[in-house]
Swiss-Prot record:
Binding site for heme: C433
Gene name, Swiss-Prot/TrEMBL: CYP51G1
Tissue-specificity statement: Expressed in leaves, roots, stems, siliques, flowers, flower buds and seedlings.
Subcellular localization, as worded in the UniProt entry: Membrane
Reaction catalysed by this enzyme: a 14alpha-methyl steroid + 3 reduced [NADPH--hemoprotein reductase] + 3 O2 = a Delta(14) steroid + formate + 3 oxidized [NADPH--hemoprotein reductase] + 4 H2O + 4 H(+)
Function recorded in the entry: Involved in sterol biosynthesis. Catalyzes the 14-alpha demethylation of obtusifoliol to 4 alpha-methyl-5 alpha-ergosta-8,14,24(28)-trien-3 beta-ol.
Cofactor needs: heme
Protein name per its UniProtKB record: Sterol 14-demethylase
UniProt similarity note: Belongs to the cytochrome P450 family.
Keyword flag Protein biosynthesis: no
Gene Ontology process terms (BP): methylation; sterol biosynthetic process
Membrane topology of the entry: Single-pass membrane protein
Predominant localisation class: membrane
């Protein structure tokens, strides 16, 4: 009897599931975008309904490598609850980068950042307020501010590497991660954090960082231990920065750092930023730059040590600058480092830390692919592009998988020859990375010091890509043998 009851329940369950599936298919047929003409091709995968989701979850880049040759530069992936339309390449991605927020919005797709950044900032506010907050970032990253930050970057690099011995082996990835957070603490979070609270604040940021998991994208408020630690860390950071902000205001003391810029920032209506907003903006700034800078610094060094011709070219550039300026390094001298700039830019082309950029479509629009076909992208789709894939398109970059910094040299400039949005390691258009100049200066300050003061050799195998990280980085150890020297 019990077995019969279980069989009946199983059959009933199967009927219910089958009914729901059929209902969804019927609903999709009558409400689908298929009535529209010129829809992009759709990724087909087995089993139906969930096959595309399974393929996507195995890795967006793996999926793009498989489907781009078959489907082209515009295609849709059905993730059951959402449809993502990919726009790959400058011919079709211009609207992605240039569209207004009312047409293509960041807010919905990046809501998972809100628990980390906190209330009242960035993706927790409407576009008009977010634009004002981005203005605060822009003002904090003006050239006159950057010149002061460079002095701090150089000092931090000198102090950090002075602790290395005459020779030895280090994991350069770990070393650069530590130096980047020290530098960011000084330039962004303020002297108080750097000098007195660095260990405490670093530990709290570590908990914030570890609270951003793949599942956080779908369920940012899920009550799991990592999210609870994230929330406690966010609350504690608010308390720490409230004390620092209050102390600065009471004493009238000012500093040349991003914290001070945010404290002094005012909205158009005259309202000053609150302590909570300042904390949230600082967290957003650190998250935007910390991982990307340390990852790019590591890749840059790994490639320089792998390809001796580029290492020699970067070294010769430093020798020429020393002959011209002496040992001094400042903002203007860093700006003269064109060879090192191209080496960093090429590392970023091959390894942009953010592999996908997304927007939510609020209106229909059309794009025309390289082959002349025009496609209609319906309202309601998530629209995406991939710097990691687009930066390796062979019709834009010659031998795209080869490290070749000279592709950006005068006379070649492959990124410019192919037109706008050909190189998108820092995004572009309305939502281009505000911290791009800061990042280049920071990485140049580090590597110019290393080139001038150390002989370097990569002793571990060339690193692989860590596709499992939220911000795609360098997998495993990157062991480097060093020996002190004085470049002249």
């Amino acid at each position: 009897m019990e077995l019969d009851s279980e069989n009946k329940l199983l059959k009933t369950g199967l009927v219910i599931v089958a009914t729901l599936v059929i209902a969804k298919l019927i609903f999709s047929f009558f409400t689908s975008d298929s009535k529209k003409k010129r829809l992009p091709p759709t990724l087909k995968a087995w089993p139906p309904l969930v096959g595309s989701l399974i393929k996507f979850l195995k890795g967006p880049i793996i999926m793009l490598r498989e489907e781009y040759p078959k489907l082209g530069s515009v295609f849709t992936v059905n993730l059951v609850h959402k449809k993502i339309t990919f726009l790959i390449g400058p011919e079709v991605s211009a609207h992605f980068f240039k569209a207004s927020e009312s047409d293509l919005s960041q807010q919905e797709v990046y809501q998972f950042n809100v628990p980390t950044f906190g209330p009242g900032v960035v993706f927790d506010v409407d576009y008009s307020v977010r634009q004002e907050q981005f203005r605060f970032f822009t003002e904090a990253l003006r050239v006159n501010k950057l010149k002061g930050y460079v002095d701090m970057m150089v000092t931090e690099a000198e102090d950090y590497f002075s602790k290395w011995g005459e020779s030895g082996e280090v994991d350069i990835k770990v070393e650069l991660e530590r130096l980047i957070i020290l530098t960011a603490s000084r330039c962004l979070l303020g002297r108080e954090v750097r000098d007195q609270l660095f260990d405490d604040v670093s530990a709290l940021f570590h908990d914030l960082d570890n609270g951003m998991l793949p599942i956080s994208v779908l369920f940012p408020y899920l009550p799991i231990p990592a999210h609870r630690r994230r929330d406690r860390a966010r609350e504690k950071l608010s308390e720490i920065f409230a004390k620092i902000i209050g102390s600065r205001k009471r004493s009238g003391k000012t500093e040349n750092d991003m914290l001070q810029c945010f404290i002094e920032s005012k909205y158009k209506d005259g309202r000053q930023t609150t302590e909570s907003e300042v904390t949230g903006l600082l967290i957003a700034a650190l998250f935007a730059g910390q991982h990307t800078s340390s990852i790019t610094s590591t890749w840059t060094g790994a490639y320089l040590m792998r390809y001796k011709e580029y290492f020699s070219a970067a070294l010769d550039e430093q020798k020429n600058l020393i002959a011209k300026h002496g040992d001094k390094i400042d903002h203007d001298i860093l700006s003269e480092m064109d060879v090192l700039y191209r080496c960093i830019k090429e590392a970023l082309r091959l390894h942009p830390p953010l592999i996908m950029l997304m927007r939510a479509s609020h209106s229909d629009f059309s794009v025309t692919a390289r082959d002349g076909k025009t496609y209609d992208i319906p309202k309601g789709h998530i629209v995406a592009t991939s710097p990691a894939f687009a930066n390796r398109l062979p019709h834009i970059f010659k031998d795209p998988d080869t490290y070749d910094p000279e592709r950006f040299s005068p006379g070649r400039e492959e990124d410019k020859a192919a037109g706008a949005f050909s190189y998108i390691a820092f995004g572009g258009g309305r939502h281009g990375c505000l911290g791009e100049p800061f990042a280049y200066l920071q990485i140049k300050a580090i590597w110019s010091h290393l080139l001038r003061n150390f002989e370097l050799e990569l002793v571990s195998p060339f690193p692989e890509i860590d596709w499992n990280a939220m911000v795609v980085g360098v997998k495993g150890n990157v062991m480097v043998r060093y020996k002190r020297r004085q470049l002249s």
